[in-house]
C-alpha cells in the first residue's frame, strides 16, 4: 500500500506572488561571444561586423550625450535656432542608436550599452564639464561626427568585402547620409560671416 506525501505547508506569513527582486545570474553570453545564426555569413564576417557596430554604437551614444549637453548650454544671439537644431540632431542620432543596437543583436552579438562601458570604448574626445564658447561647441560636434563617419566608412568597405549587405545598407543609407547632413548643417554656423554687412551701410549715418 502506497502512502501519499502531504503537501509541504508554506511558512507562516509567506505571501504568494511576491516578486523575487534579488536575483542575480552568471552571464549567459559574454560580450565577446557571438550566437550562431543562419545568416549565410562566415563566423569571421559576423564577428567583424559586430565589433565595428559596437564601436559606432559607443561613439553614437557619446555623440547623443554631447548634443544634449550643448543643447542645454548653448547661449548667444543664435540661441533659439541652435537650441532647436541641436535637439533635432540629438533625436536623429538617438534613433540611429536603436538601429545600430538591434543590428548587433541580429548578428548574434552583445550590445555595448552601459555608460561606463561606452565611456571606455568611445573614440570621441571628452568635453569639459563646464561651458565652452558657441564656436568651440560646434567645432567639437563636427569633430565628433568626423570620428563616427570614419568608422562608418571603414565599416562600409568591410561589409561590402564580407558580403554583409544588410549591415552595409544600414551604414550607408541609415547612418552615413544622416551624419553628412548634420555635419553640413552644423559647419555652416562656423563660417566667419557677420550678421550685418557693415560695408553696405551709408556713410554719415
Residue locations for each model-derived region?
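A structural signal for well-ordered alpha-helices, especially hydrophobic packing surfaces
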Residues: 57, 64, 71, 90, ...
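Conserved alpha-helical segments that form or flank metal/cofactor-binding pockets of metalloenzymes
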Residues: 68, 74-117
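Alpha-helical coiled-coil oligomerization motifs
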Residues: 105, 112, 157-160, 191, ...
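Short, contiguous alpha-helical
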Residues: 95, 169-201
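Disorder-to-helix initiation segments
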Residues: 34-56, 134
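Acidic, low-complexity proline/glycine-rich segments
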Residues: 6-39
Amino acid at each position: 500500500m502506497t502512502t501519499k506525501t502531504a503537501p509541504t505547508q508554506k511558512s507562516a506569513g509567506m505571501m504568494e506572488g511576491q516578486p523575487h527582486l534579488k536575483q542575480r545570474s552568471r552571464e549567459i553570453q559574454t560580450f565577446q561571444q557571438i550566437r550562431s545564426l543562419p545568416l549565410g555569413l562566415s563566423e569571421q564576417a559576423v564577428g567583424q561586423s559586430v565589433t565595428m557596430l559596437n564601436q559606432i554604437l559607443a561613439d553614437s551614444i557619446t555623440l547623443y550625450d554631447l548634443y544634449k549637453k550643448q543643447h542645454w548650454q548653448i547661449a548667444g544671439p543664435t540661441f533659439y535656432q541652435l537650441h532647436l537644431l541641436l535637439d533635432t540632431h540629438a533625436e536623429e542620432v538617438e534613433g540611429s542608436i536603436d538601429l545600430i543596437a538591434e543590428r548587433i543583436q541580429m548578428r548574434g552579438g552583445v550590445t555595448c550599452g552601459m555608460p561606463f562601458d561606452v565611456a571606455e570604448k568611445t573614440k570621441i574626445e571628452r568635453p569639459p564639464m563646464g561651458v565652452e564658447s558657441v564656436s568651440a561647441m560646434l567645432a567639437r560636434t563636427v569633430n565628433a561626427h568626423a570620428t563616427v563617419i570614419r568608422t562608418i566608412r571603414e565599416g562600409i568597405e568591410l561589409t561590402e568585402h564580407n558580403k554583409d549587405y544588410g549591415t552595409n545598407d544600414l551604414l550607408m543609407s541609415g547612418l552615413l547620409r544622416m551624419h553628412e547632413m548634420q555635419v553640413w548643417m552644423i559647419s555652416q554656423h562656423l563660417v566667419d560671416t557677420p550678421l550685418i554687412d557693415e560695408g553696405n551701410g551709408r556713410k554719415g549715418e
